[in-house]
Amino acid sequence: IIIIFMSHLILIRHGQSEWNLQKKFTGWVDVDLTPEGKLEACKAGEVIKELNIKIDHFYSSFQIRSINTLKFIQDTLRNKIQPVKAWQLNERHYGALTGLNKDEMKKKLGEKKIHEFRRSWDLRPDPLSKNNPYHPINIEVYKSLGKEDIPDTESLKDTYERVVKYYKENIEDKIKKNNNILISAHGNSIRSLCKFLFKLDEKQITKLEIPTGNPMMIEFDKNGKISNCLYLDKERAQDLIVF
C-alpha cells in the first residue's frame, strides 16, 4: 500500500455581494450576498463536495458575505466544524473611496487614477473619516478590536502584511501537518495570499483577478511545496489566471 501524504488549501472569494452588483467600493463595510451570490456559494459547495476530501479547518473573515458564503458551503458539505472568524482575512480597506460608485469615481478622478488605487501595490486612498458610519470604529462587530488594529485606509501592501502574518501564525503549520483547509475571504485578501504562496512580484499581483464564488484548490506535497493549483468550477475557469 502506498500512502500519499498531501494537503489541500481551498481559497474562495465570497459570492457576488450587493455592492459588487452596484459597483461600489466595499472594503470593510458589511454587505450581504445577492441571490446570484448565494447560488455561486451553493455551486462552490457542490464542486468542493465532488472532490470527496475531508476539510479539517474552515476560516472566514469578520464580514457577512464571507461568513455566509462559508455557511452555504458547509451546509452543502454537511460539515458542522466550527469555523474560525479572523478580521485579518477581511477585504482591503478602501478609505475615503468606501461606499462610492466605481464608474462615477472614474469620471471624477479619471480611469488611470482609479486603476492605480485598485491595483497598485503601496498606494493608499485618502483615509475614511472616523465620523463616517462606514468607518469600522462605528460598526459593532469591530468593537472587540484594539484601535491600533482598525485601519482608516489600506494599500494592497498593508492588506498583504496582515493576511500573510495571520496565515503564517495560524494556518501554515496545519498545511504542513497534512490538514485540508478552506478559507472564505475576499478579492484582495486572496490576492495577497496568492502573492505569498506563488511568490508573485508586484507587477504580477496587479494583473491577478480573483472571481467570485469559484474555489481555487492548491495542493501541497509531503514537503509542503505546491504541487498543483486549479479552479474547481471548470465552466468559469477558462479565462482565469491559474499558476
List where the protein language model places each region.
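Short, well-ordered strand-loop elements centered on a beta-strand within folded domains, enriched
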Residues: 223-236
